[in-house]
Amino acid sequence: AHYPDEIVISKAIKRLYDWTELLKPSRKGIGKSKQMGLWGEMFVLHEYMSGVHPIKDAVNFWIGPDNKKQDFTLNHMALEVKTTMSGSAPAIKITSIEQLERITDRLYLIHIFMNKGNEPDALSLNDLYDQIIESINDDTETKTNFLFSVSKIYGKATDTERNEKFVFLNYNLYEVDENFPNILGGDLPDAI
C-alpha cells in the first residue's frame, strides 16, 4: 500500500513520541498487584501462548498492557489472566466489569497460583522478559512490538520488583459462559 508522505511522517512522529513517553525515567514502582499481574501475563505469554502459536502471533495477541478488556485476544476467543499468591483468599479480584464481558465467541479466565521463591525454577519479571526476548530471536518487528507493550508497565517497575522471584504452582482455567458467575454492565443501574 502507498501512503501519502504526510501520513507516514505523522505516524513516525507519533511512534517516536510514544517511545519518548515510555522511556522517560519514572521507575517509581508498580506495586504488588501490577507486579503479580504482569508476571502472570508474561508467564502465560512465554509458557502457554508461545508454545501453541508462533512467538510473533503470541506477542501480537497480548494486549494486557494496553488496558484492554482482556489480556489476550486471538481469532474468536479472549483470555483474561488473574494471578494470586498461594494461600490468598480463593476469590478472584476483577478490576473492571468489562473484564468478564464477552466480546468474542469464547472468553476464558486463567487463574495462576504462585509463591515467592528462590528455587531454580523461580522466575522474576527480568527472567521472563529475557526468556521472551530470547525466543523472539532476530525478529525486529516482533521484538519492537513486545518492547513497546511490556515497557508500559515493566518500564515503571523498580529493580526490586523486576528481580523478585516467584514459583509457578498451578492454574485453573474457566470458560466464561452464561453459567459463569458475573455481573454485566447492562445489568447495572445507570447510577452505579
Where are these regions (language model features)?
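Nucleic-acid endonuclease domains
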Residues: 1-67, 84-192
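Conserved catalytic cores of phosphodiester-cleaving nucleases, focusing on short active-site segments
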Residues: 48, 72-85
